[in-house]
């Protein structure tokens, strides 16, 4: 280590001597002006690059507007004393008072050229404002952006913080003070700088090595912990086996967050088009994914959806699984933002309902139940171990096109670009528009702009209204071709009297024999429900793209809702479902069911779809039994 340190010191000392000998005073003039070295223009490469960029941007007529007058040598300015600036950059005219040692007098040095285009500002502000600072010798610079040799007759501003007469006297009396700064440095000062720089470099290298070793150890420990957890939990093993086979659930963040994901994507085809961009099917490391593309004008929506997907404990069976987010520049030089999720072949719920195949009652109930489970998970605040906590989330754009069918009878909620989070007693993002979403599915309080944005529960109730319309879309695709089971009395039973229903119903032992019931298919009681073609809510009532005034008249003033099918009353499950719809799209938000209430009701309806008939039969049995007992008592 000591030998290496001494070698570095010796090498630095000789390198300093070489720099001192080769120092060029003309370069010092440019550096003192704070003009970047490539501001003057690079002879051929720079001109070719600018011309190439202009051709790519289809603006060949702008070349004349980018030409500046240049008085440097031919290698920089070319044959016609011209340099070409970038779009947005400036042409400059710089002046400096230089002391002529041979003639012992001050001379004004003029320089014309092209300034560089600074990153971030889209102009040449730093170069053009360098005259405002004090310099070792009088300097100034003037800029113009019009091009077309606008700097040729440009007059720079007056010198700042320096008087010409005083500068001339100082240079005449003490010309050695205006030599190169490196020449005025003592040999001891140079050595001190070299030693200090070398020592700091050594410490920096040691620090970097230490950080690399520490991070490697932390990653190794993290992998070991993850491996231990995967051996203990079967769900984690299934998730690692196939990331795209099942969305799974968990308390961590989403699967991948990388800036290099696009390089591993192989785009296959376009599968959809939305208001923010397009959705394409792609292959990512051997698995199919859906790539949602956002344009730069919708960057806020991309950031919000990415942040929602990265929320702790967001993973759920009925929430579309997030894979990664990335920013990429396509071949057309347009920057696009990518959001990558699981790909599901069945597509959206709207596409699924448009198929020729109809739904059974059980299929419809399970599709609706899975959607409500996803919404309930979004609406609920989940507290995990430690600091893990999932905030309440309102979707704000529930519709059949934003619901994906993962597999038969199972849906998941997608498109969280407009979602809001209620975290730490405040709504995120802090700046948002209240009246957003699809107008056809918007709740009355949103259409009439009466929703209180400070009450987060009202956003969740608006989701319930939208979900009720989706429930109606699913229900109209149900087709039932069965005969209803009707309770009748067996008139041939010896224990039954045709006139009163009592007769010889009491045996000699005093026991009451129950009325004989049988299931028969009675003409006029058959249930035949034909499925209707899938249409969006309020189809035929409003236009394809209704405005707020039209929707306000329909759902707020006239209070129109999608009509239920009259045949639903003959199907117990659909009859109960229609009641849930009516409660959920109520005009008053607080009268609607919560997502948790709907989730429980749908689970019970799936478990017991004939509960309405059974409850009616139970009442009939109780009435019949009470009538028999009363008759028997009177006879006795």
From Swiss-Prot:
It comes from Caenorhabditis elegans. Residues 491-510, 608-636 are annotated as: Disordered. This is Serine/threonine-protein kinase receptor sma-6. Glycans are attached at residues 80, 184. It is a single-pass type I membrane protein. The chain crosses the membrane at residues 191-211. Interacts with sma-10. Interacts with drag-1. Residues 212-636 are cytoplasmic. Residues 265-606 form the Protein kinase domain. ATP binds at residues 271-279, 292. Gene3D superfamilies: CD59, Phosphorylase Kinase, domain 1, Transferase(Phosphotransferase) domain 1. It is found in: Membrane.
């Amino acid at each position: 280590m000591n030998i290496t340190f001494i070698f570095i010191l010796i090498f630095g000392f000789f390198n300093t001597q070489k720099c001192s000998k080769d120092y060029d005073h003309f370069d010092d003039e440019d550096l003192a002006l704070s003009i970047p070295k490539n501001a003057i223009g690079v002879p051929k490469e720079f001109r070719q690059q600018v011309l190439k960029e202009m051709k790519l941007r289809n603006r060949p007529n702008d070349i004349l507007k980018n030409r500046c007058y240049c008085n440097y040598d031919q290698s920089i300015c070319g044959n016609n004393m011209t340099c070409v600036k970038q779009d947005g950059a400036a042409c400059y005219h710089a002046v400096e008072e230089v002391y002529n040692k041979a003639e012992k007098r001050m001379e004004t040095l003029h320089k014309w050229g092209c300034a560089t285009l600074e990153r971030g500002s889209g102009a040449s502000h730093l170069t053009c404002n360098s005259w405002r600072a004090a310099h070792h010798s009088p300097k100034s610079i003037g800029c113009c952006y019009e091009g077309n040799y606008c700097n040729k007759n440009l007059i720079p501003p007056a010198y700042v913080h320096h008087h010409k007469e005083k500068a001339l006297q100082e240079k005449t009396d003490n010309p050695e003070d205006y030599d190169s700064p490196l020449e005025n440095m003592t040999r001891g000062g140079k050595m001190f700088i070299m030693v200090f720089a070398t020592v700091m470099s050594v410490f920096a290298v040691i620090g970097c090595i230490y950080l690399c070793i520490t991070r490697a150890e932390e990653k190794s420990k993290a992998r070991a912990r993850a491996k231990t957890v995967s051996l203990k939990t079967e769900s984690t093993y299934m998730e690692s086996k196939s990331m795209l086979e099942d969305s799974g659930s968990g308390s961590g963040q989403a699967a991948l967050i990388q800036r290099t994901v696009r390089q591993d994507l192989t785009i296959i085809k376009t599968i959809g088009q939305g208001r923010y961009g397009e959705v394409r099917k792609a292959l990512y490391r051997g698995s199919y994914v859906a790539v949602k593309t956002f344009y730069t004008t919708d960057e806020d929506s991309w950031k919000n959806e990415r942040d929602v997907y990265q929320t702790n404990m967001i993973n759920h069976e009925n929430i579309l699984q997030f894979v990664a987010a990335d920013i990429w520049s396509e071949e057309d030089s347009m920057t696009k933002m990518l959001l990558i999720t699981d790909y599901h072949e069945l597509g959206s719920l709207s596409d699924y309902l448009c198929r020729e195949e109809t739904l059974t009652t059980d299929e419809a109930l399970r599709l609706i139940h899975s959607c409500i489970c996803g919404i309930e998970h979004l609406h609920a605040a989940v507290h995990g171990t430690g600091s893990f906590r999932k905030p309440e989330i309102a979707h704000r754009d529930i519709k059949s096109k934003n619901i994906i069918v993962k597999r038969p009878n199972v849906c998941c909620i997608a498109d969280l670009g407009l979602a809001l989070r209620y975290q730490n007693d405040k709504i995120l993002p802090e700046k948002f528009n209240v009246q957003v979403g699809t107008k056809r599915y918007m709740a009355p309080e949103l259409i009439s702009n009466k929703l209180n944005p400070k009450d987060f529960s009202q956003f969740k109730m608006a989701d319930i209204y939208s979900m009720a319309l989706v429930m109606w879309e699913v229900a109209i695709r149900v087709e039932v071709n069965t005969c209803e089971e009707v309770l009748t009395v067996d008139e041939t039973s010896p224990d039954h009297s045709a006139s009163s229903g009592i007769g010889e119903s009491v045996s000699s032992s005093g026991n009451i024999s129950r009325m004989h019931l049988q299931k028969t298919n009675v003409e006029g009681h058959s249930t035949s429900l034909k499925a209707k073609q899938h249409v969006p809510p309020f189809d035929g009532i409003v236009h394809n793209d209704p405005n707020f005034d039209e929707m306000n008249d329909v759902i707020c003033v006239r209070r129109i809702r999608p009509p239920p099918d009259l045949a639903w009353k003959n199907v117990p499950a659909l009859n109960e479902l229609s009641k849930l719809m009516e409660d959920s799209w109520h005009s008053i938000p607080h009268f609607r069911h919560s997502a948790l209430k709907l989730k429980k009701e749908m689970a019970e309806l799936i478990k017991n779809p004939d509960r309405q008939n059974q409850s009616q039969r139970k009442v009939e049995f109780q009435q019949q039994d009470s009538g028999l007992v009363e008759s028997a008592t009177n006879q006795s």
